[in-house]
Design a protein with these regions (language model features):
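Solvent-exposed N-terminal domain segments of exported/luminal and surface proteins
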Residues: 32-260, 267
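Long, C-terminal catalytic modules of enzymes
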Residues: 436-460
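N-terminal signal peptide c-region/cleavage motif recognized by signal peptidases
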Residues: 23-25
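Short, Lys/Arg-enriched N-terminal segments with co-localized hydrophobic residues
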Residues: 1-7
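Extended beta-strand-rich segments in extracellular/periplasmic secretory proteins, especially
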Residues: 177, 183, 190-239, 297-373, ...
Length: 460
């Protein structure tokens, strides 16, 4: 298609050729004929290349995100890309029912509860500017025919560092796309708040975090046992948590027994590092004062083993998008309203999303009986979700506030938060303090992400 680079097209074709040999194995991905749509009618990531009928969703722009005038080249301060745009639509308490078909169940729940209090969506023009490196596209094309789920969906075989399932055939494949999404190494200082039922903002955490992504270093080797991310969080507030450290190694392809997540904690009271298997699933997350679970972070993370996953289909939905101004430029304290984030700081766009519904497996335990996810077709990130309690009531809902790291190699970064409709509280996590976000690991080596070095840091 026009605009897709010749290099990219050639690398996709070569990958499809390799993939067609792999595809002869019994459980492989889609047929080479289907996969040939990548880079043609579908983007290299499997999204629909074209816009929608009424033009409210444009065609994908392979040129990538624009560089705004005020951006300093090489800086990690990714200011808003569309500073002169105004909302083209405001969906509020008086008109939301007209737009019901394009709202998530959670957003409808917010209007029902807070529409009269000023909850609204400020909708801006849609910009589909998400791009990835050419090697990532080539690996994605290879994966389309060669990657396959085994071990009851707990493991991917035959995948290279790219999107594992650009043309998903199941809910499990779609959620794996979200779980091992493309990311760049970063380090940041951030504050996490929750707002209690009286409308008071409470600091849950101040911390420094470093995330690196080993899986995307060796671009021409299968993922295998490689780690998707190593994350280390050093806490400095509140006082009772100052000095605590959390370390997580998250797999790139394998959650089978003995594999999967490895987590360690350094607790100042114990003055030692210990394995922390409870840093997973529905354990309340102290990073947000227990207001959501560990597996709520980034809307969903971790092993998919406790749920049945269903791919419901695709829909046009209003979700947060291109929120650089909020994520990188806005002071969080200024955005915290008594019942919800200030609607003036959040940018919404109409997007095509994959809807994935998950229900708790028989015999499994979890606080949530059901969860629904809305996965953006361009980024393959769950931008919104809903969590239901054991009685089937809508309990919590979440949004990711995505931002684009533009420039040399486009990256995806996000903050995220949840609303609790039963307890009337909400939280916001992972938003950098303005000016305190940096690309790269901040000069630390991979040893920094080991229990040994963590123990030394803790003792200091």
């Amino acid at each position: 298609s026009e605009g897709v680079s010749i290099t990219m097209q050639n690398s996709i074709k070569a990958a499809l050729l390799i993939g067609s040999f792999v595809a002869s194995s019994a459980l492989a991905g889609v047929s080479p004929e289907l996969a040939a749509q990548l880079g043609n009618t579908l983007t290299p990531m499997g999204a629909e290349m074209n816009g929608n009928e009424d033009g409210s969703i444009p065609a994908w722009d392979p040129a990538g995100p624009p560089i705004p005038a005020g951006y300093e080249e090489g800086s990690s301060n990714y200011i808003g890309m569309y500073p002169d745009e105004e909302p083209i639509l405001v969906i509020n308490g008086s008109n939301w029912q007209e737009y019901k078909d394009n709202l998530t169940v959670g957003t409808i729940g917010m209007f029902e509860k807070y529409g009269a209090d000023g909850w609204e969506l400020q909708v801006y023009p849609t910009h589909r500017v998400s791009t990835r490196p050419d090697w990532y596209y080539a690996n994605t094309a290879k994966n389309a025919t060669g990657a396959t789920l085994v071990a009851d969906g707990q493991k991917i075989e035959g995948n290279y560092p790219g999107l594992p399932f650009p043309m998903p055939q199941s809910g499990l494949e779609a959620i794996w796309n979200h779980m091992i999404r493309f990311s760049k190494d970063i380090n940041q200082d951030y504050d996490t708040y929750y707002v209690d039922s009286s409308g008071k903002p409470i600091l849950a955490t101040s911390a420094h975090s470093v995330s690196v992504y080993p899986m995307f270093r060796k671009t021409d080797e299968p993922v295998g046992d490689e780690i998707w991310t190593m994350l280390r969080i050093d806490y400095n507030a509140p006082a009772r948590r100052a000095g605590e450290i959390l370390l997580v190694h998250e797999p790139g392809a394998d959650y089978t027994a003995g594999k999967g997540r490895k987590a360690w904690q350094y607790l100042t009271g114990q003055r030692r590092v210990r394995l922390a298997p409870a840093v997973s699933f529905d354990t309340p997350n102290p990073g947000v004062a227990g207001t959501t679970t560990y597996d709520d972070s980034f809307v969903y993370n971790g092993s998919p083993e406790r749920f049945n996953w269903k791919l419901v289909g695709k829909k046009e939905i209003y979700i947060p998008a291109n929120n650089n101004e909020f994520v990188f430029e806005t002071k969080l304290e200024d955005a915290l309203g008594p019942k919800f984030l200030d609607p003036n700081v959040i940018r919404w766009e109409k997007r095509r999303v994959w809807i994935v519904d998950s229900t708790l497996k028989e015999g499994q335990r979890h606080l949530y009986s059901r969860r629904t996810f809305y996965i953006d077709e361009d980024d393959w990130v769950a931008m919104a979700g809903e969590m239901y309690d054991g009685r089937g009531n809508l309990w919590r809902l979440q949004y990711i506030y995505p931002a684009v790291q533009y420039g040399n190699e486009t990256g995806f970064f996000s903050s995220y938060g949840a609303y609790d409709l039963l307890q009337n509280i909400y939280n916001l996590n992972g938003k950098p303090i303005p000016g305190r976000f940096q690309n790269g690991s901040g000069g630390v080596s991979d040893k920094f992400f080991t229990p040994k070095v963590m123990a030394r840091s803790g003792v200091r």
